[in-house]
UniProtKB/Swiss-Prot annotation:
EC supergroup of this enzyme: ligase
Residues annotated to bind ATP: T65, P66, A67, G68, E69, G70, K71, S72
Stated name of the protein: Formate--tetrahydrofolate ligase
MF terms in GO: ATP binding; formate-tetrahydrofolate ligase activity
Alphabetized InterPro entries for the sequence: Formate_THF_ligase (IPR000559), Formate_THF_ligase_CS (IPR020628), P-loop_NTPase (IPR027417)
Amino acid sequence: MKTDIDIAQSITLKPITEIVEKVGISFDDIELYGKYKAKLSFDKINAVKDNAPGKLILVTAINPTPAGEGKSTITIGLADALSKIGKKTMIALREPSLGPVMGIKGGAAGGGYAQVLPMEDINLHFTGDMHAITTANNALSALIDNHIHQGNVIGIDQRRIIWKRVVDLNDRALRKVTVGLGGPLNGIPREDGFDITVASEIMAILCLATDINDLKERLANIVIGYRFDCSPVYVRDLAVEGALTLILKDAIKPNLVQTIYGTPAFVHGGPFANIAHGCNSVLATTTALRLADYTVTEAGFGADLGAEKFLDIKVPNLPKAPDAVVIVATLRALKMHGGVAKTELSAENVEAVKAGFSNLKRHVENIRKYGIPAVVAINEFVSDTAAEIAVLKELCAAIGVPVELASVWANGADGGVELAETVVATIDNQAASYQRLYKSEDSLEEKVTKIVTQIYGGTGVVFEKKARNQLTEFAKNGWDKLPVCMAKTQYSFSDDQFALGAPTDFDITVREFVPKLGAGFIVALTGDVMTMPGLPKAPVALNMDVAADGTAIGLF
């Protein structure tokens, strides 16, 4: 069987100039990064800003398991299938982070015959956006430490700096470090730490900014720490937002690539959904809506994280809410949610499918709370049996949700035609009536509680002492009217990663809040979620190499 990289390297790509013509983008509208990658100019973005938006399809999933759900694969395959049935379609995806690519994922550009290309470039350095975000983040760290070293005119309390350095790798050794050692010429010693780049607030800002001016304003609003009198210190107090914007002036432009079947795709921005808001850039999604009749996008991890954040944080910054939400599930994952061990997933187990359906059902119910119709996509595996498929279809029918098999990994666009037709029919026959889960005027405590009780299915929220004190502090600062971005394990509705299925009678513990005023939300840290991942015992980097002719080996 061919691997993803084997398939990708067997495809003859078309010049990106030819691909983007399908959606009305000319040679003069793009900035080329070789023959197959480009960035879209702001002139073109501004030229289409008054176009009526097309239909928006959000792809999400059940809570992920080690068995894998294939959300990006379905996103790409669905878009190719929409193109195949005659719909003018674009994709809007996130950029992969090099840390997970070298750790456990091996790549994040789809799979099989549903990939965005050139996958090697996309999975590695691409157009340099990650480097620019990393540099801007660390430039701010350097400027903070320099300000303190040079006299600390604005009175930053070096014990209360919350801004961390970043690197686009999984490196647990950098979670906590000490900087400024080596004597007075090397700065003021203080505790610091590293996050992974995709957890940086600058990544979130880049993905929520609507133009250069908005980017600069958001950067100016970043809270980097506190003074000795406990008042917040903003980037604007250091007067460096202009320099940071300069570093990011090209990174903010959306990247254009293609699928195996030639569907134009924006791949831009990449915040994680468990520790950030998990969506590609507003600029990419908005521009795709202005250029195409159908835009297919995705949100990270399960619908309890990525979709909730898409609908509560990203949608208010878009021209419209989704017309439909596709929830990806696999029979293998449903069986795991039903109590089957990973080693036994290939064996038929209808009862486990029935038990695991509770997870999918809760996600469907949650999407409906937003007033948006849902469609279930079963990402097909060779181990799926007719009996398992039949019972899943019966269970979906019982709750009135359309369901289709999708074999886009093996069959590309052909394997997604029925799904595409069902999604189009759903959009045509069921008008979405989007409503946000909470109101802006709700307190932080109320917002978190609504997410926990209405989306996660929990009983309530336990705020640890630090978080409880921050509720008062943030309300005093006027920050409590911002949206909440929950940092939680992706594997469960609860904050216990081992509580699979649809757990009930649990509380979520919030240990701390982190203000992300530039991004425009407050992060609530739960459980033991970390903003700098570590590598597994056997990282997939051990299998990566490059041939003498420069061909990449080991990505998947």
